[in-house]
C-alpha cells in the first residue's frame, strides 16, 4: 500500500514545488518593483507610452524609466503625470514652469491670490501672510505633447489650468527602451491574448510534470 502511495506523494511534492517556485518568482518581482518605487520616489517607476502624442521623441510601446526625486521640472523636460480622477499616465513635455517666486496663470488674473491676501489682512498677521503666500505658489507646470498642436489644458481635470509638481507628476523620464512595452498594449487592446498566454503557461506546467 505504501508502494502505491509513493508515486502520488512524488507527484504532489513536485506540484507543490512548482507552486512554491511560481510564488517565489511573483514575490521577488513584487519586491523588486516596490524597491524601485522607493528608490525613484515614484508610484510607477516604469511606464509604457500608450499614444503617439510624443512622436518622434517616443513611439507607442516604448518603455520609460522614471525618476521623481527632483524638486523641480524644468522647461523642455519630459514628464509623466496622472490626470486627477483618472489612472491613465500621460507622457508629455514641460512647456512652461512657474517657480516659487513666479505667478501662475490664475494668480496673474488676481483671483486666488487676492482671496488669500484679503483673509490674511483680516487676521492681521503679517508674518503669517508671507508664509502663507509662499506656500501657496508651489512649483507648477504646463505640459504639451510634441505631436500635439495645443497644450494639455483640455486634458487636465475640470477647473485645473496647470499641474502641481508634487501632486500630479509620476516622474521625469530618465531613460527608455524602444518598443518593449508594446506587448502590454496588445494585451490591453486584445483581451483574448491574455487567455491564450494563460493557456500556454498551463500547458507548459503540465508538460513539465510529465
Curated annotation (Swiss-Prot):
Family annotation (InterPro entries): LexA/Signal_pep-like_sf, Pept_S26A_signal_pept_1_Ser-AS, Peptidase_S26, Peptidase_S26B
Transmembrane spans: 22-38
Keyword annotations from UniProtKB, A to Z: Endoplasmic reticulum, Glycoprotein, Hydrolase, Membrane, Protease, Signal-anchor, Transmembrane, Transmembrane helix
Superkingdom of origin: Eukaryota
Glycosylation sites: 41
PANTHER family from the UniProt entry: SIGNAL PEPTIDASE COMPLEX CATALYTIC SUBUNIT SEC11
Subunit annotation: Component of the signal peptidase complex (SPC) composed of a catalytic subunit SEC11 and three accessory subunits SPC1, SPC2 and SPC3. The complex induces a local thinning of the ER membrane which is used to measure the length of the signal peptide (SP) h-region of protein substrates. This ensures the selectivity of the complex towards h-regions shorter than 18-20 amino acids. SPC associates with the translocon complex.
UniProt note: domains: The C-terminal short (CTS) helix is essential for catalytic activity. It may be accommodated as a transmembrane helix in the thinned membrane environment of the complex, similarly to the signal peptide in the complex substrates.
Protein name, UniProt field: Signal peptidase complex catalytic subunit SEC11
Name of the gene encoding the protein in the UniProt record: SEC11
Amino acid at each position: 500500500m505504501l508502494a502505491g502511495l509513493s508515486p502520488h506523494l512524488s507527484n504532489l511534492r513536485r506540484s507543490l514545488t512548482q507552486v512554491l517556485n511560481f510564488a517565489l518568482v511573483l514575490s521577488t518581482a513584487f519586491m523588486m518593483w516596490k524597491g524601485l518605487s522607493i528608490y525613484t520616489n515614484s508610484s510607477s517607476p516604469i511606464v509604457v507610452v500608450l499614444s503617439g502624442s510624443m512622436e518622434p521623441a517616443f513611439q507607442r510601446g516604448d518603455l520609460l524609466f522614471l525618476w521623481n526625486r527632483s524638486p523641480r521640472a524644468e522647461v523642455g523636460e519630459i514628464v509623466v503625470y496622472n490626470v486627477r480622477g483618472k489612472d491613465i499616465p500621460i507622457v508629455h513635455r514641460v512647456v512652461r514652469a512657474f517657480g516659487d517666486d513666479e505667478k501662475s496663470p490664475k494668480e496673474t488674473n488676481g483671483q486666488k491670490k487676492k482671496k488669500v491676501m484679503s483673509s490674511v489682512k483680516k487676521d492681521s498677521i503679517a508674518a503669517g501672510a508671507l508664509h502663507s503666500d509662499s506656500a501657496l505658489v508651489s512649483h507648477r507646470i504646463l505640459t504639451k505633447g510634441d505631436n500635439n498642436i495645443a497644450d494639455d489644458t483640455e486634458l487636465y481635470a475640470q477647473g485645473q489650468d496647470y499641474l502641481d509638481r508634487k501632486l500630479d507628476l509620476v516622474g521625469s523620464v530618465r531613460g527608455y527602451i524602444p518598443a518593449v512595452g508594446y506587448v502590454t498594449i496588445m494585451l490591453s487592446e486584445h483581451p483574448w491574448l491574455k487567455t491564450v498566454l494563460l493557456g500556454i503557461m498551463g500547458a507548459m506546467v503540465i508538460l513539465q510534470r510529465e
